[in-house]
Curated annotation (Swiss-Prot):
This is Adenosylcobinamide-GDP ribazoletransferase. Pathway: Cofactor biosynthesis; adenosylcobalamin biosynthesis; adenosylcobalamin from cob(II)yrinate a,c-diamide: step 7/7. The keyword Ribosomal protein does not apply. Keywords: Cell membrane, Cobalamin biosynthesis, Magnesium, Membrane, Transferase, Transmembrane, Transmembrane helix. It comes from Clostridium botulinum (strain Loch Maree / Type A3).
Amino acid sequence: MKSILNDFLLMIQFFTRIPINKNLQCEKANFRRGAFFLPVVASIIGGMEFLIYLGLKNFLPSNVIIVLLLLFTAMITGGLHMDGLADTCDGFFSLRDKERIIEIMKDSRIGSYGTIALIIDLLLKYQLLYSLVLKGYSIAIFLAPIIGRISILFLCLSKRTAKKNGSGNIFIGNMSKPIVFFISTIVLVLSTYFLGLRATIIPFIGALLITYLLYLLCLNKINGLTGDTLGACNELGEITFLLILLMM
C-alpha cells in the first residue's frame, strides 16, 4: 500500500504543480508502476477544470470561462506539455540534422516555430472547447486531458529513445502493455458512459492515429523519442480528440 501511494504521489509531483511535501522513491520501477496513475492524475486535472466550468457557467459567458480554464491548465501543469510541443516544433521545423535538432529542443529559449505552435495550440483548444460546450459536450473539458495522457502511454510503448539521458527516458520503453491496455479500456468505458460508443471510439482512434504519425515523424527526425515529444503527443492527442468529437 505504501508503494502504491508513493507511485501515485510521484505522478502528481512530476506532472503537476500541486505541492507534495514528501520525499518519494524515484526509481525507474516507480515510474513504470506509476504510469497506471497517469490517467488518474489527468482525471484530477480535468475534474478540477470541469468543476470550475460548472461553478462559473451561471455567472460568466462560456468563452470567458474557457480562457480561464486554459490559464488554469497552464498553471496546474506548469505548461509542461505545451513546452514540449513548442520545443518539438522549434527542433523539427529547423530542418537540421539529428544532433542539431536535439540541441535546439534542449534550448530553454523559445523560437518562432515554437511560438507559432503555442498560439495555434491555444487557439484550437479555445475554439474547440467553446464549440463543444455550445453543442452540449461540456464533459469534453473533463475527458480531453485523460485522452492526451493515454496517448503518451501508447507512445511510450516504444523503446526508441533519441538521447542516452533525458527526462523522457524514465517513461519511454518503460511501460507495461497490459497496464496500458487495461487503463485504456477503463477510459473508453468512462467516455462511452458520457458520450456514447460512436462518439468515444472514433475520436479515440483518431488520437491514437496522430500519436502513431508523430512517432513516425520522430523516428525520421531524431531516430527516437524525447520528453519534449511526449509533451507534444499530449497536446496533439487532446486536440485531435476534441476536433473529431466536434465533427461527430
